[in-house]
């Protein structure tokens, strides 16, 4: 939950739990689901159809039970922040519609007992490094 060194370390050590049931029945029709998907995209400032997002906003109340009224998420429930432009399952309309329609089961087991503190620390450093821009190659002197 988050990209800080401590957050990465906690995710590796303690695991993560994020289960979202299919919500199509609660949201409504296929058009309602697509409108909610446009609203979800609007929360992160991503490209979306503003008129469809406006229609989806009231239906987002179903989603707000876990994601919050502003879409900021709830770590205890495993509901991700929808405002941060971090998309684990694709950021397009079709990917979001699929998540609303089919749900998701995103569980990561805890690894602290298996790896131990030192290896969790090293793995967290490695994962953090994956999110950093690669440094420019150092110039080498000619022969």
Named regions from a protein language model:
Residues 134-138:
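Extended amphipathic alpha-helical coiled-coil/heptad-repeat regions
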Residues 48-73, 84, 97, 101-102, ...:
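Sequence/structural segment immediately N-terminal to covalent heme-attachment motifs in c-type
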């Amino acid at each position: 939950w988050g990209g800080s060194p401590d957050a990465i370390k906690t995710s590796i050590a303690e695991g993560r739990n994020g289960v979202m049931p299919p919500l199509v029945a609660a949201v409504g029709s296929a058009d309602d689901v697509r409108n909610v998907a446009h609203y979800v995209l609007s929360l992160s400032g991503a490209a979306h159809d503003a008129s469809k997002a406006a229609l989806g906003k009231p239906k987002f109340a179903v989603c707000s039970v876990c994601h919050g009224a502003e879409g900021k998420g709830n770590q205890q429930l495993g509901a991700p922040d929808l405002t941060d432009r971090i998309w684990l399952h694709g950021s397009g309309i079709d990917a979001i519609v699929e998540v609303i329609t089919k749900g998701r089961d995103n569980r990561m087991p805890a690894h602290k007992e298996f790896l131990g503190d030192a290896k969790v620390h090293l793995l967290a450093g490695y994962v953090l490094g994956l999110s950093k821009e690669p440094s420019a190659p150092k110039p080498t002197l000619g022969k």
